[in-house]
Amino acid sequence: GDLPGVKYEDIIYECYGPNGVAIILECLTDNKKRTVSEIKNILSKSGGNLGESGCVNWMFEKKGTITISKDDIEEEKLFDLQIEDFEVCDEHYILTTTPDNFGDVSSFLEKDNVNIEGEVGLVPKNTVEISNNDSSRVLNLMEQLDDHDDIQKVHSNFEII
């Protein structure tokens, strides 16, 4: 539970990682100075840095993302949904919706007994391609940020090729 007298703040940090990767961190902290100091330290060790407010936010847009198993639905049914796009993967589909349509699409699928995993979050408008050789630095940074107690969500725009 919460400790009496401790106030938590939601904070968004915009950062650059190695290879020009854009990163947005959604944080919840009781000590902004400690959190920003720890984030700067993690970033600098990986060749990244903390940016100014607004420096990478424009590279992302809010979207609903829903992942469903191919076994749960026929591909033709996807065209009847209020989705913007869908991606076909090995064993599942990844659906993209507007934030406004996310709830309706999720409810429709659940009524049809389709198991869903989904959320409304920040999706990159474009991605930065990272070669397999350069990927370890970026993946290591993402893991360190993800493991930080005050960081609730990590959004980035890289794609390993």
Feature names for model-found ranges:
Residues 3, 43, 47, 113, ...:
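Structural signal for hydrophobic packing residues in well-ordered secondary-structure cores
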Residues 62-161:
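Positively charged, low-complexity, intrinsically disordered RNA-binding extensions
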